[in-house]
């Protein structure tokens, strides 16, 4: 269960102010004379929408209910727009003031639809957060299930066993062997060549006993299938849109704070190899970073 933080609601009062303006002016207009009933439906619907969104923001679960919120807000935008059309052309000042309140609600709704409907990696998301559009605290996103079950990750010596590497014939061009039977010690003519080939392919199953004590395969060509060399070039720069705490059970992950700048070597996967300004390197989830 997420921790309730009502500071998120206090920091974004525009929708509530617009609704109070619409409600007060609609009450005055209804007392003074005839008033369209549809405007009351818009007032009630937007009140329910504001309460629901306030609870979502307070519980910091907008990433869970974002799709549903966008659907409800789309209907609310239709209702407020129709309410404006039914009030703004009247000569009564209170109805025109009510139309102004619905216009403000429509503007806030448009911003909300963009905020909840866009990805957290968009460049405008931090700006909207600073202006109080959502103010979702990043700590709720920084959960352990994300770091352990997020997706495919680069395998290293520490993080696990890497499956055998498979190569195509084009990649092995130049490493062919002239020996008709695999698994026998290389001859003097093709020893170096087969030694290089065995580095990629290895002896046939059951033929290790045929190598004898004179085989120098391990000494001449040490095989480290689990080792992945660290990149030396980091051509990309990324900015952290949320803080992230590395999983203590995985030494390959790195922690970083919100708005911290990282150097990134590869942006093709879900986990990026990153380097901090302090020189610390490791992997970071791509949905916490945005390229700059």
From Swiss-Prot:
Extracellular side: 30-37, 85-96
One Pfam family hit: SH3_1
Sequence segments annotated as region (Disordered): 127-149, 203-231
Protein's job: Plasma membrane osmosensor that activates the high osmolarity glycerol (HOG) MAPK signaling pathway in response to high osmolarity.
Subunit-level organization: Forms homooligomers.
Top-level taxon of origin: Eukaryota
Domain SH3 intervals: 233-292
Biased composition (Polar residues): 140-149
Annotated TM spans: 9-29, 38-58, 64-84, 97-117
Record Gene3D superfamilies: SH3 Domains
Family that this chain belongs to: Belongs to the SHO1 family.
Residues exposed to the Cytoplasmic side: 1-8, 59-63, 118-292
Compartments where found: Cell membrane
SMART domains: SH3
Record's bilayer topology term: Multi-pass membrane protein
Name recorded for this polypeptide: High osmolarity signaling protein SHO1
SUPFAM superfamilies referenced in this protein's UniProt entry, alphabetically: SH3-domain
InterPro entries for the chain: SH3-like_dom_sf (IPR036028), SH3_domain (IPR001452), Sho1_SH3 (IPR035522)
Key words of the record: Cell membrane, Membrane, SH3 domain, Stress response, Transmembrane, Transmembrane helix
Cellular compartments per GO CC: plasma membrane
Organism of derivation: Ajellomyces capsulatus (strain NAm1 / WU24) (Darling's disease fungus)
PROSITE patterns, per the entry: SH3
Gene giving rise to this polypeptide: SHO1
